[in-house]
C-alpha cells in the first residue's frame, strides 16, 4: 500500500480542488454510493500517516476554520505542513500520480486497524462530513486523467482499471481514486505525534517503542508509533542503520535506536522531496539482489506468529544479527 510520502503527494494533488463543488460522480464503490457526493462542496483535505481525508459540506461557505493548506516539500529533517510552491508540482491539469505497480505484494501493517474508525453512510443533511480514503496495494489518485492498462490480464484482456470513485468539479477538472476503501468519518483520525512526516513527530515515544523485546522490523510497521511507515521505509532504514531486521529492540543500545529513527525520518523526507521534485526513488536494499557494498541480499517474510508476514530484504554482512544480550555503550 502507498506509504506516507506518496499519500502526501496524493494530498497535494487533491488540494487545488478545495473550494469547488462536485457536479458529477462515478465509480465502482459499493460501500459508499458515489451519488451521495453529488452537489457537495469539497472544503478541506488532510493527510495523516497512510490515510487521506476529504471534508465535504452542503454549502460553499461552511468550510471549517483553519483548513489545511497543501503541504510544502520538506526543507528540513522533518516535514513541514505549510503551503506548497506551485511551481514544483504545477497545476492539476493533466497530472497523475505513480501507482507503484512495480512493488511486490504488501499487506496492512500491524496496528493499522480500520474497524474502530469506520462509520455507516453519513446522514443526509449532516454538515462537515469527512470521507476517509484508505489505499490498497496499488492505490492511487489521478487528476484529469484515468489509469490505463499496462498489460493484459490473465484472460488476455487489455481492460483498464476501474476507478473506485470519480469526482467531477465545477471548475472543469476531475479526480479518480483507484484501489481504495472509502468510508465516512465524523472527523479525521489525527495523531501527529506518531506521523513520521509531521513536525510534531514524537521521537521519545518512537524510541521507547523500539526498545520492546520484539524484532525491530515488527515495531517499525506498528502505525501507533510510526504512522506512514511501510515496507520500503522499513527495509531502507534498517539497512542504513546497519541493524538486522530480527534484532530485538531490547538489546539495541539507545544510540542505535536513535540512529534508526534518524534514518526513518531522513529517508521518508527525502522520498517526499523527490516526489515533489520529480526525482525517481532510489533504494539500496529493497527488492535488490546486492547491497551497495556488493554483498548478496537476503529476502524472507517476517512478522508476528499471529500477525501479517511482510517481505524483508537485508544484507547479512552489513546487518549482522545481534545476540540477545544488550549492547554495551562504549566510552572513549
Curated annotation (Swiss-Prot):
Transmembrane segments: none annotated. One of its GO terms (cellular component) is nucleus. The keyword DNA repair applies. It catalyses: 2'-deoxyribonucleotide-(2'-deoxyribose 5'-phosphate)-2'-deoxyribonucleotide-DNA = a 3'-end 2'-deoxyribonucleotide-(2,3-dehydro-2,3-deoxyribose 5'-phosphate)-DNA + a 5'-end 5'-phospho-2'-deoxyribonucleoside-DNA + H(+). Its main location: nucleus. Residues 94-104 have a biased composition (Polar residues). Detected in testis, skeletal muscle, heart, brain, placenta, lung, pancreas, kidney and liver. DNA binds at residue 231. Residues 74-84 have a biased composition (Basic and acidic residues). A zinc finger (FPG-type) spans 284-320. GO terms for molecular function: class I DNA-(apurinic or apyrimidinic site) endonuclease activity; damaged DNA binding; DNA N-glycosylase activity; microtubule binding; zinc ion binding. Gene3D superfamilies: 1.10.8.50. Acetylation of Lys-50 leads to loss of DNA nicking activity. Acetylation of Lys-154 has no effect. Residues 59-121 are annotated as: Disordered. Changing residue 318 to S: Loss of glycosylase and AP lyase activity. InterPro entries: DNA_glyclase/AP_lyase_DNA-bd, FPG_cat, Ribosomal_uS13-like_H2TH, Znf_DNA_glyclase/AP_lyase. CDD domains: MeNeil2_N. Its EC number is 3.2.2.-, 4.2.99.18. PANTHER family: ENDONUCLEASE 8-LIKE 2, FORMAMIDOPYRIMIDINE-DNA GLYCOSYLASE. The zinc-finger domain is important for DNA binding. Involved in base excision repair of DNA damaged by oxidation or by mutagenic agents. Has DNA glycosylase activity towards 5-hydroxyuracil and other oxidized derivatives of cytosine with a preference for mismatched double-stranded DNA (DNA bubbles). Has low or no DNA glycosylase activity towards thymine glycol, 2-hydroxyadenine, hypoxanthine and 8-oxoguanine. Has AP (apurinic/apyrimidinic) lyase activity and introduces nicks in the DNA strand. Cleaves the DNA backbone by beta-delta elimination to generate a single-strand break at the site of the removed base with both 3'- and 5'-phosphates. Binds EP300. This is Endonuclease 8-like 2. It comes from Homo sapiens.
Amino acid at each position: 500500500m502507498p506509504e506516507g510520502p506518496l499519500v502526501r503527494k496524493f494530498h497535494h494533488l487533491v488540494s487545488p480542488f478545495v473550494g469547488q463543488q462536485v457536479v458529477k460522480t462515478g465509480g465502482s464503490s459499493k460501500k459508499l454510493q458515489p451519488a451521495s457526493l453529488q452537489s457537495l462542496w469539497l472544503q478541506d483535505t488532510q493527510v495523516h500517516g497512510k490515510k487521506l481525508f476529504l471534508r465535504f459540506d452542503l454549502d460553499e461557505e461552511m468550510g471549517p476554520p483553519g483548513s489545511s493548506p497543501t503541504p510544502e516539500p520538506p526543507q528540513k529533517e522533518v516535514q513541514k505542513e505549510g503551503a506548497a510552491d506551485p511551481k514544483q508540482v504545477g497545476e492539476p491539469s493533466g497530472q497523475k500520480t505513480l501507482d507503484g505497480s512495480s512493488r511486490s505484494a504488501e499487506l496492512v501493517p500491524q496496528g493499522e486497524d480500520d474497524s474502530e474508525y469506520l462509520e455507516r453512510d453519513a446522514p443526509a443533511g449532516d454538515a462537515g462530513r469527512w470521507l476517509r480514503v484508505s489505499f490498497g496495494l496499488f492505490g492511487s489518485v489521478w487528476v484529469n486523467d484515468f489509469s490505463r492498462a499496462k498489460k493484459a490480464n490473465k484472460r488476455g484482456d487489455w481492460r483498464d482499471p476501474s476507478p473506485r470513485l470519480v469526482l467531477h468539479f465545477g471548475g472543469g477538472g476531475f479526480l479518480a481514486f483507484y484501489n481504495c476503501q472509502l468510508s465516512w468519518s465524523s472527523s479525521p483520525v489525527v495523531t501527529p505525534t506518531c506521523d513520521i512526516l509531521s513536525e510534531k513527530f514524537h521521537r521519545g515515544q518512537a524510541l521507547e517503542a523500539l526498545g520492546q523485546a520484539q524484532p525491530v522490523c515488527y515495531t517499525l510497521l506498528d502505525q501507533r508509533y510510526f504512522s506512514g511507515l511501510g515496507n520500503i521505509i522499513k527495509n531502507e532504514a534498517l539497512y542504513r542503520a546497519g541493524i538486522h531486521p530480527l534484532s530485538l529492540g531490547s538489546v539495541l543500545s539507545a544510540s542505535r535506536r536513535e540512529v534508526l529513527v534518524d534514518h526513518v525520518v531522513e529517508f521518508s523526507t527525502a522520498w517526499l522531496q523527490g516526489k515533489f521534485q520529480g526525482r525517481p526513488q532510489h533504494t539500496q536494499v529493497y527488492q535488490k539482489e546486492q547491497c551497495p557494498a556488493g554483498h548478496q541480499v537476503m529476502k524472507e517474510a517476517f512478522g508476528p506468529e499471529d500477525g501479517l508476514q511482510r517481505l524483508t530484504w537485508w544484507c547479512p554482512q552489513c546487518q549482522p544479527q545481534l545476540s540477545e544480550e544488550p549492547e554495551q555503550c562504549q566510552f572513549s
